[in-house]
């Protein structure tokens, strides 16, 4: 997926299979809205998401906001989300903003509660 404006730096959100995704290019003000729109469709069918950021070339506070939005989405829809190789600028902004711990909040399983198995005893 790419943003529609030719002036905006490009990004790519690639599905690698099994709930794994790779984001490359810009992760910031110029692309965050388009990345969010693309991710809604791509993430919907996965209970566990693993997102790789090693190919991100630019990031800013909007990138941090997007990562936090994905965590909020994951909690709301009872998904697990893990981030790999978060860009250093985003980590620095998160540290200064005192939200570093939130970047790991989506890592624990928050799936739906399973109903207990039905009793095998006979009913009268």
Residue ranges and their predicted role:
Residues 1-59, 69-124:
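STAS-like cytosolic regulatory interaction modules
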